[in-house]
Amino acid sequence: MENQCLPKKVPGFCSFRYGLAILLHFCNIAIMAQRVCLNLTMVAMVNNTGSPHLSNESVVEMLDNVKNPVYSWSPDIQGLILSSVFFGMVVVQAPVGYLSGIYPMKRIIGSSLFLSSLMSLLLPPAAQVGAALVIVCRVLQGIAQGTVSTGQHEIWVKWAPPLERGRLTSMTLSGFVMGPFIVLLVSGFICDLLGWPMVFYIFGIVGCVLSLSWFFLFFDDPKDHPYMSSSEKDYIISSLMQQASSGRQSLPIKAMLKSLPLWAIILNSFAFIWSNSLLVTYTPTFISTVLHVNVRENGLLSSLPYLLAYICGILAGQMSDFFLTRKIFSIVTVRKLFTTLGSFCPVIFIMCLLYLSYNFYSTVIFLTLANSTLSFSYCGQLINALDIAPRYYGFLKAVTALIGMFGGLISSTLAGLILNQDPEYAWHKIFFLMAGINVTCLVFYFLFAKGEIQDWAKEIKTTRL
């Protein structure tokens, strides 16, 4: 709305909307820690020197007694276990996209976070039973985590002023990289000192505590918040007046299918999650096979990309909103800029990793940069749907996430198959495929992305003569 309608003084960082971003930040840390911890503990859980067993039964080796049980799972089984979380995430996207605009997000996100944490607590005993039960736990965890990661975007339709979207969403989404940083940093030490099962117990308990906090601290609509100042309420409501004035109408499916700006977002979501899932899932494996380090050193090295990614994500949020508030660039230019940085920079550093990494240090540097620069996309295509169709944002995020999850599922599973069949040239094939997908989708985005609300996303007003 017009600037004169907005309050002159509103709380900045010390406000409830930023408090909500921090709360979601910690929730995202929890679900990512629960998802990623298996990537590193798998190194300690599996006997790579023993004969593989393709059955669903876990063969326990007498190693370190109960503290560190070891199983003989083949690379195919390991790849299926690691990627099974994406099966659950894929299944839940469409229902969450529909329900997020109907049911309170307090219940949806709070209960889903609790379910994910419960599955983390149950995973060590499930491993004792067999690989099949581990896969079941991971699928259920994927359903819960997909609900949290997709449903939370609907929150910002009512809570994020347009000129603060970059900062609020980047602060929230940066939890997705801080989670892996924390879990990879400490999991190696936990495995050595307490055994790998304690990794799942610790992060499961943390998630349970956060889910209870969510029920007490979150309110679906800022106008219903009992402790928020009237100035902050007026600021949020006034800034969102244009897009929040009308309720959700029937979905313009045909118009959506014909929308090239929407397809640009969808394809780049596919490329982003393909790359992100691949690097998150297989960075510990790459470090173990290429650099030949122990579990503790593996965890430390695997955590470095996420620390830098966290910094890049926060920096991207500040920069994008700075460009918009100072009117240096238009919305579409900002989205294209950060999408390009988040898609093309990882490709450059992956190629450097394959052809210019001559020693231990150069390998670590290029791998760290390839992982971390993905987070520039937080202020690019990942929030572009909020620009072009705020009224359907929850549904569109579910659709883009659904198609993106297929990318994550395919990349994780395919990488496991390639590593099993062609160990010598596997990483070249895996990374070249990732680079090709990133560049192709980026070109499409650069040609067709938009920053203004599309005609099919505007309220239709009928006039009678």
Swiss-Prot record:
Spans traversing the lipid bilayer: 79-99, 117-137, 176-196, 199-219, 260-280, 304-324, 337-356, 363-383, 399-419, 429-449
Originating species: Mus musculus
Tissue: Kidney.
Membrane topology term: Multi-pass membrane protein
Xref: Pfam families: MFS_1
Glycosylation sites (chain numbering): 39, 47, 56
CDD domains linked to this entry: MFS_SLC17 (cd17318)
InterPro entries in the record: MFS (IPR011701), MFS_dom (IPR020846), MFS_Na/Anion_cotransporter (IPR050382), MFS_trans_sf (IPR036259), Pi_cotranspt (IPR004745)
Function per UniProt: Important for the resorption of phosphate by the kidney. May be involved in actively transporting phosphate into cells via Na(+) cotransport in the renal brush border membrane. Plays a role in urate transport in the kidney.
GO biological process: phosphate ion transmembrane transport; sodium ion transport; sodium-dependent phosphate transport; urate metabolic process; urate transport
GO cellular component: apical plasma membrane
Domain of life: Eukaryota
Binding partners and assembly: Interacts with PDZK1.
Record's keyword terms, sorted: Cell membrane, Glycoprotein, Ion transport, Membrane, Sodium, Sodium transport, Symport, Transmembrane, Transmembrane helix, Transport
GO-annotated molecular function: phosphate transmembrane transporter activity; symporter activity
Protein name: Sodium-dependent phosphate transport protein 1
SUPFAM superfamilies assigned: MFS general substrate transporter
Organismal lineage: Eukaryota, Metazoa, Chordata, Craniata, Vertebrata
Family membership: Belongs to the major facilitator superfamily. Sodium/anion cotransporter family.
Subcellular location: Apical cell membrane
